[in-house]
């Protein structure tokens, strides 16, 4: 019985995600048409709203518990494990009021429509090519110099 519930809940969550993506597509397109930094920041603001609505509609609750509050006026390198599809939406809920870029795998850029949004909002890394990995690190450093925090998931 539990497996059946998990299956239907997964399908429900996926349909909610698709519905929200379709509703927000004009906002993502507008953000995509902006300059790279401004457009990327807009994508994260839209994604934070999407995460709030998604978690509300799927009745998933969370509570932020900080060992120490960080200064939102400074840039940081956030590091986390990434083992679930919910990790990134949860990260959207945790890192608030601060611009951020995620280091993400280049393979995600190939997904129709989502890939274009993903590419604008992340720093893509081709893990099979040492030169491209180095280029991605340099791009992250540039974002830090622009006062934008970065988020990496070394195990994801």
Sequence positions of predicted segments:
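Soluble catalytic domains of membrane acyltransferases
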Residues: 57, 61-156
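A transmembrane-helix-recognition feature enriched in membrane-embedded lipid enzymes
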Residues: 2-64, 116-120
């Amino acid at each position: 019985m539990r497996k059946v519930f998990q299956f239907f809940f997964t399908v429900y969550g996926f349909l909610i995600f698709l519905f929200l993506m379709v509703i927000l597509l004009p906002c993502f397109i507008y953000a995509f048409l902006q300059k790279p930094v401004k457009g990327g920041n807009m994508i994260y603001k839209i994604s934070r709203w999407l995460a709030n609505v998604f978690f509300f509609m799927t009745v998933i609750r969370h509570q932020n518990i900080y060992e120490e509050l960080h200064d939102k006026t400074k840039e940081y390198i956030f590091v986390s494990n990434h083992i679930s599809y919910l990790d990134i939406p949860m990260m959207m809920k945790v890192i608030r009021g601060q611009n951020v870029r995620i280091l993400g795998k280049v393979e995600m850029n190939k997904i129709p429509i989502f890939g274009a949004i993903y590419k604008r909002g992340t720093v893509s890394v081709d893990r099979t090519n040492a030169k491209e990995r180095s280029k991605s690190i340099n791009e992250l450093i540039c974002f830090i110099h622009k006062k934008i925090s970065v988020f990496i998931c070394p195990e994801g």
